[in-house]
Amino acid sequence: LPVSAREAYENPFYLEAIRGVSQLCNKRQYINTVITGESEEEILQVIKTMARSGQVDGFIVLYSRQDDPIAGFLYNEGFLYVLVGKAYAHANQTIYIDNDNLLASQEATEYLYQMGHRRIGYIGTDTSMIFSADRKSGYQTALLQHNILPRADYCVEIAASEKDSAPLRCLLSIPDRPTAVVVSDDILAVTLERVCLEMGLSIP
């Protein structure tokens, strides 16, 4: 799991992924262990200890991040691993499973455009997370296809562990605020909904 166990366990994506992995491992009579921590250094140390114990056959990394030291270690040491998300480095030598995040965001933005919206914002996690970078790119591509220049003040990026809703309030407080927003994941969407309600803004 990515850094910060609390946020990871609050995210339904990770919970569903863990459930699926556990079910399959149980059927095959494999033992699986969930690894997470408060820092990359902590996670990496646990992985090094487990990998070098000789008791681990492989790893499933439930995220993909730019310049990730954990994926880098597994690759450099020749351990078997699978990434959930697009590989940032060594893509041709890495087994990874991904959906088309760029297309998904592009279609979401296009839907809002067809609904009549022209001031469309974007809220995502920081773009070191590959899925978030792709979703932001898809959003920007859809706007440019309609000759709409993406506005920097319409794009908010919040670290996965960030709890401060101030950037969202700032976005919703500008005079010509967006009339619609593309959000990169469910957790941020729930946060945005809460902020809108607190500010007295209606959501269709």
Residues of each region from the PLM?
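Short beta->alpha connector loops
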Residues: 38-41, 62-68, 162, 186-187
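Short, contiguous strand/loop micro-motifs
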Residues: 5-9, 33-37, 51, 56-58, ...
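Bacterial carbohydrate/catabolite-sensing allosteric modules
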Residues: 20-30, 73-83, 87-204
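Short acidic active-site motifs
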Residues: 42-47, 69-70, 163-167
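Amphipathic helical "hinge" segments at domain boundaries
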Residues: 1-46
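Short, electropositive alpha-helical surface patch
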Residues: 45-58, 136-140
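Short, glycine/serine-rich, charged loops/turns that create anion-binding
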Residues: 4, 39, 66, 88, ...
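Short, flexible loop segments at the rims of nucleotide/cofactor-binding pockets, characterized by
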Residues: 35-39, 58-61, 98-100, 156-160
